[in-house]
Structure formats: C-alpha cells, structure tokens
C-alpha cells in the first residue's frame, strides 16, 4: 500500500484490549480498534488509556487502524 492512500486521524485511547489492541475515539467521534505500529513496539513506547495518539487507517476498512505516534 502506498503512503498516499493512508488516512491519518488524531484520537484518544479509551480502553485497553487484550492482545495489544486499543479502543480509540477519534476526533470525529468514531470509535475504532487499533494496534501499535512495529516501530513503536520496537522502541517500547507505552500507550495507556487517556493518551492522545495519531492513527493511520486504510480507506478500505475504516474500523481498524494502526497507532503511529503518541503525543507528549
């Protein structure tokens, strides 16, 4: 998938789910399920409930996403 096809949204983690998944509420009030990107896992960046994050989504499935950045 090329980089141009990726949609980016900001949101807040509202719930931690099993298997390193998170329930995220986006700025446009949609709720999605997201997992951490490999680079965040590699650098051991922790994501907790209440954290403000950036999520990448594909236009083909708007219910799942990948957490790419945690705001400080």
UniProtKB/Swiss-Prot annotation:
Domain of life (superkingdom): Bacteria
The places in or outside the cell where this protein is found are: Cytoplasm
Q: Which Pfam families match?
A: eIF-1a
Gene Ontology molecular function: ribosome binding; rRNA binding; translation initiation factor activity
Q: Name one GO cellular component term.
A: cytosol
Q: Does the keyword ATP-binding apply?
A: no
The reply on keyword tRNA processing is no
What's in the keyword line of the UniProt record? Cytoplasm, Initiation factor, Protein biosynthesis, RNA-binding, rRNA-binding
What quaternary arrangement does the UniProt entry report?
A: Component of the 30S ribosomal translation pre-initiation complex which assembles on the 30S ribosome in the order IF-2 and IF-3, IF-1 and N-formylmethionyl-tRNA(fMet); mRNA recruitment can occur at any time during PIC assembly.
**What family is it from?**
Belongs to the IF-1 family.
Function summary = One of the essential components for the initiation of protein synthesis. Stabilizes the binding of IF-2 and IF-3 on the 30S subunit to which N-formylmethionyl-tRNA(fMet) subsequently binds. Helps modulate mRNA selection, yielding the 30S pre-initiation complex (PIC). Upon addition of the 50S ribosomal subunit IF-1, IF-2 and IF-3 are released leaving the mature 70S translation initiation complex.
Name of this protein: Translation initiation factor IF-1
Gene responsible for this protein = infA
């Amino acid at each position: 998938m090329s980089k141009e096809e990726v949609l980016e949204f900001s949101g807040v983690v509202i719930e931690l789910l099993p298997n390193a998944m998170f329930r995220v509420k986006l700025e446009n009030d949609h709720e999605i399920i997201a997992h951490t990107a490999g680079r965040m896992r590699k650098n051991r960046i922790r994501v907790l409930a209440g954290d403000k994050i950036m999520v990448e989504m594909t236009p083909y499935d708007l219910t799942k996403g990948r957490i790419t950045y945690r705001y400080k």
